[in-house]
A protein has these predicted regions:
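Glycine-rich FAD pyrophosphate-binding loop
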Residues: 14-37
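Short loop/edge segments at beta-strand edges and connector loops
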Residues: 71-73, 219-223, 239, 400
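Dinucleotide-binding Rossmann-like beta1-alpha1 core, especially the glycine-rich loop
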Residues: 38-117
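Conserved Rossmann-like nucleotide-cofactor binding loop
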Residues: 7, 27, 256
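Active-site/ligand-binding neighborhood in enzyme catalytic cores
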Residues: 83, 93-94, 100-227, 231, ...
Length: 434
């Protein structure tokens, strides 16, 4: 099992036979990890658990004592044209300049009329936004926000990922939201679960501790994979001199990285891996030594003039993530490569209501990860199918957010691990199963 993020931990958790779980880092969790400094706790931006699968909910809740998990109703806002709107934008236009509201409603009506005439389904993400919500809503939210998130990849983005993650209100909700009847609670993430002690790393650490009591599950940290020999069904690890045989190999490392470790991969597989694209991430952890005006958990910021596209207040979800009277923020930056204009960021946070005064800031830490979002372009579907199909023919299941090269959440990763364990059981000899 390659990678001890949530997918890898879940695979080991559900495994029916002996499993060796290896992780390159010095701790488990993958992107579901936390850092702590001076009484503040920061995740890798917002990691809120949205639980719908009953078995996964039972797994998570079983790791914590009563009172150690909080169920929280989402408080999310959108900052547009100087107004702080409830989420989602398309169902809460009230508060925007009247000309913008009119443009959005007229565009929505025109889009519905086109749909009634049987207009073809769009294939691009921008086309989806314009077709489903109209040109105005697309122009004032979906295009500018996603331009900041996806950068240069937006124009190539398909609509393959939108069905679950973008709320689609009906006409009554859109009209109601435009005249001031707030339409909240829409979307897949209207409620979330989070450790009351602060820090999403409590989840993978609880799983690690539970797995430590299972003789059939071995965890090796600080261990990377050098090479996979698919002919001999063996793997070379950085911490071991000898090749390690495998009956079934489950990998959660980024899909292109796995293929690069397989010298025997055919040209078509290598080409498919080379065609995959991703978005890297840069954000700021901001420790504030005073209360902040914001009462929301996170806010989307489509305004092009502001240097960030999403801001969250950790301590509004779990007060333990900051010292008493303080607040902890995450600020997701639009620019992923250039110098950070911190005064501009802090001024924008004041405008947003996430900060009262820049002088309240105790410290700021800039952080980044290479793999954040996979890009759903025209090559994605066929390339992914080629890769996953070939790998399974070699007794390799590549899964999870980056192993499966998909857009998903933490619960999905836990489900993917459960499914991978079921798959692996078909490759492990019966006498070796627990």
């Amino acid at each position: 099992m390659l990678g001890a993020g949530l997918t890898g931990l879940s695979t080991a958790w559900h495994a029916q036979g002996p499993v060796l779980l290896v992780e390159r880092a010095d701790r488990v969790g993958g992107h579901a990890r936390s850092v702590r400094r001076d009484g503040f706790t920061f995740d890798i931006t917002g990691h809120w658990l949205h639980l719908r699968d009953p078995a996964i909910r039972a797994l998570v809740e079983g790791l914590f004592l009563p009172g150690e998990l909080a169920t929280i109703d989402r408080r999310t806002r959108i900052y547009s044209h100087g107004a702080l709107l409830p989420y989602p934008f398309q169902a809460n236009l009230h508060g925007l300049p009247l000309a913008v509201v009119q443009e959005c409603l007229v565009g929505y009506v025109a889009a519905r009329e086109r749909a009634a005439r049987g207009a073809p389904e769009p294939t691009s993400f921008v086309g989806f936004a314009e077709d489903r919500f109209g040109a105005g809503i697309a122009r004032h939210f979906f295009v500018p926000y996603n331009r900041k998130l996806w950068g240069e990849h937006l124009d190539a983005l398909t609509a393959a990922w939108v069905s679950r993650y973008i709320p689609i209100p009906d006409t009554a909700q859109i009209v109601g939201g435009a005249i001031g009847l707030a339409q909240e609670g829409l979307g897949y993430n209207a409620r979330f679960v989070y450790p009351t002690a602060g820090g999403i790393d409590h989840l993978p650490e609880r799983m690690r501790a539970a797995l430590a009591s299972r003789p059939a599950a071995a965890l090796e940290l600080g261990c990377d994979v050098e090479e996979v020999d698919v002919v001999g069904r063996r793997i070379k690890l950085t911490t071991r001199a000898d090749w390690q045989p495998y009956a079934a190999l489950v990998s959660t490392i980024p899909l292109p990285e796995l293929v690069r470790r397989i010298p025997g991969a055919p040209a078509a597989v290598r080409d498919a891996a080379a065609s995959l694209r991703h978005v890297r991430w840069r954000w700021l952890d901001v420790a504030v030594g005073a209360p902040v005006p914001a009462d929301w958990h996170w806010a989307y910021v489509p305004e092009p003039r502001l240097p960030f596209f999403r801001v969250g207040v950790y301590s509004n979800a779990a007060a333990t993530m900051a010292p008493p009277g303080c607040a902890g923020l995450y600020v997701e930056l639009t620019d992923r490569t250039g110098p950070i204009d911190l005064p501009a960021v802090l001024a924008g946070l004041v405008e947003l209501g996430a900060l009262r005064d820049p002088a309240d800031v105790r410290f700021v830490e800039a952080r980044e990860v290479e793999h954040a979002y996979v890009v759903f372009d025209a090559a994605w579907e066929a390339a992914r199918a080629t890769l996953l199909g070939w790998l399974e023919g070699q007794a390799i299941r590549s899964c999870g957010r980056y192993g499966g090269w998909v857009y998903n959440g933490m619960e999905d990763c836990l489900i993917a691990g459960r499914d991978a364990a079921t798959w692996a059981s078909g490759h492990v000899p019966k006498e070796a199963r627990a």
